[in-house]
């Protein structure tokens, strides 16, 4: 999993510019593994902590900009609204266009969750099944690639947390 990436917009701020301005601008999502407000009203989360540590390393304040969707992360970054993204994003070919990803900090696997008793062994076993996938997730891109080999493969994209 990749947590930080920098924009390739015209006004990229490198470490020197960030230090001069005194603030690291970070885009993120409200998510239990990324950035959220706990019961004490504190903002916490693994990627939030990593971004805050990077800001400390630079000797600057950190400003978090929370958006609702992965698409908004990419669009806001491309528009220069932030210096980087900290949101547990999976790197895909489509997502790599126009941005630079950091080295991965964690490897994750894509899994299919089925009802008890159903155990697909290969992508062809998914043909004819009702598949639901979260909007904006890397699963959509994977399914689009699998559809080239299995044209009858279909799925529905759903909104909300996935």
Description of each model-found segment:
Residues 8-11:
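Bacterial signal peptide processing site
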Residues 14:
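Nucleotide/pyrophosphate-binding catalytic subdomain
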Residues 21-45:
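Short glycine-rich His-centered loop
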Residues 36-39, 48-61, 102-103, 139-161:
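Ligand-binding cleft/hinge of the Venus flytrap
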Residues 111-162:
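Pocket-lining segment of extracytoplasmic ligand-binding domains
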């Amino acid at each position: 999993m990749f947590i930080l990436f920098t924009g390739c917009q015209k006004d990229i701020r490198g470490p020197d510019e960030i230090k001069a301005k005194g603030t690291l601008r970070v885009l993120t999502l409200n998510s239990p593994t990324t950035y959220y407000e706990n019961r004490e009203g504190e903002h916490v989360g693994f990627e939030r902590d990593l971004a805050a540590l990077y800001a400390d390393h630079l000797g600057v304040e950190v400003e978090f900009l929370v958006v609702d969707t992965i698409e908004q992360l990419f669009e806001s970054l491309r528009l220069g609204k932030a210096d980087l993204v900290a949101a547990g994003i999976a790197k895909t070919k489509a997502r790599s266009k126009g941005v630079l990803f950091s080295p991965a900090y964690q490897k994750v696997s894509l899994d299919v969750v089925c009802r008890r008793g159903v155990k697909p062994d290969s992508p062809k076993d998914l043909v004819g099944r009702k598949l639901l996938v979260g909007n904006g997730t890397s699963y959509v891109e994977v399914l689009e690639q699998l559809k080239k080999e299995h044209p009858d493969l279909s799925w529905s994209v759903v909104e909300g947390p996935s």
